[in-house]
């Protein structure tokens, strides 16, 4: 029997409030993180991801009080990211109630942090977030992928999508796995907030190159989009925000739709 796929709501938090952005820009207030987290937990979400989206760019600590409030309100696994730079930061987050930490900018800049985190907490606690954009500039040093738009490569971006790095996302995923990443949260910055579907080609390209679970993120607008990324995109989990926040498709409805489409989903 195939492993059950996971459905994961995401709380993008900016200064204590859940917001929703398009391409990580122009945030709009969407609700209170503790109230929304409890609602998702009660609705049957498999996990929850909490991302402090400005902690890295503002070079500040994560909002520990909000993390503690969310942890007390839910009964499902809980990943926290944004502003986690080292073992000390991760320990604070995990001691505040998180089950896993998501790391992004800090480990792109200092890759050995992945190994340090895995050595202390176990690789099952380390989620490596990869924010990527399509880059159509020919480059002999990159892994070119055949897509519907032609050959291109996927570039890692950091600081909430604000800074291009020149790093190939597929090569970075392989490196991060070797360093100790236990899971990847792959976000298409081209698709984020658009509600027109995930970047199937990005998700599939990374999934085919690593041997740890992949959470797909960026672009969910309807249940069919989740179906596509969980099947064609070979993702192990689908993360979404807008369709859940604005009640377009509540978690139970999405799960029911996916089951009817033949996807094995957790109860």
Feature-to-residue mapping (PLM):
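Structural preference for beta-strand elements that scaffold enzyme active sites
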Residues: 6-10, 47, 75-79, 100-102, ...
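Conserved, mostly hydrophobic/aromatic
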Residues: 12, 40, 48, 80, ...
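Conserved anion-binding
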Residues: 13-15, 19-20, 98-185, 190-191
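Short, acidic/polar
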Residues: 29-41, 85-91, 165-175, 225-226
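Glycine-rich, proline-tolerant flexible connector loops at the mouths of alpha/beta enzymes
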Residues: 47-65, 105, 185-196
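Alpha-helix-loop-beta-strand connector modules within alpha/beta enzyme cores
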Residues: 58-81, 116-131, 195-222, 262-263
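Catalytic cores of alpha/beta
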Residues: 74, 78-101, 136, 201-238
């Amino acid at each position: 029997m195939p492993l059950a796929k996971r459905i994961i709501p995401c709380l993008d938090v900016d200064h204590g409030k859940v917001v929703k952005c398009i391409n990580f820009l122009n945030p709009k207030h969407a609700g209170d993180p503790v109230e929304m987290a409890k609602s998702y937990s009660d609705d049957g979400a498999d996990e929850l991801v909490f991302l402090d989206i400005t902690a890295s760019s503002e070079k500040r600590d994560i909002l520990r009080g909000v993390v503690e409030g969310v942890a007390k309100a839910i009964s499902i696994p809980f990943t926290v990211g944004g502003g986690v730079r080292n073992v000390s930061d991760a320990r604070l987050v995990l001691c505040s109630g998180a089950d896993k930490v998501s790391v992004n900018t800090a480990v792109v800049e200092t890759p050995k942090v992945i190994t340090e985190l895995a050595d202390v907490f176990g690789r099952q606690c380390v989620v490596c977030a990869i924010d990527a954009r399509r880059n159509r500039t020919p480059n002999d040093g990159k892994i070119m992928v055949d897509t519907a738009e032609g050959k291109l490569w996927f570039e890692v971006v950091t600081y909430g999508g604000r800074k291009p790095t020149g790093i190939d996302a597929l090569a970075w995923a392989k490196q991060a796995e070797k360093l100790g990443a236990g899971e990847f949260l792959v976000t298409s910055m081209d698709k984020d907030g658009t509600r027109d579907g995930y970047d199937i080609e990005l998700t599939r390209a990374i999934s085919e190159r690593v041997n740890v679970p992949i959470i797909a993120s960026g672009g969910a607008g309807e249940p069919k989009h989740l179906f596509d990324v969980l099947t064609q995109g070979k993702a192990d989990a689908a993360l979404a925000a807008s369709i859940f926040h604005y009640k377009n498709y509540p978690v139970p409805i999405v799960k029911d739709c996916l089951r009817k489409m033949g996807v094995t989903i957790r109860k």
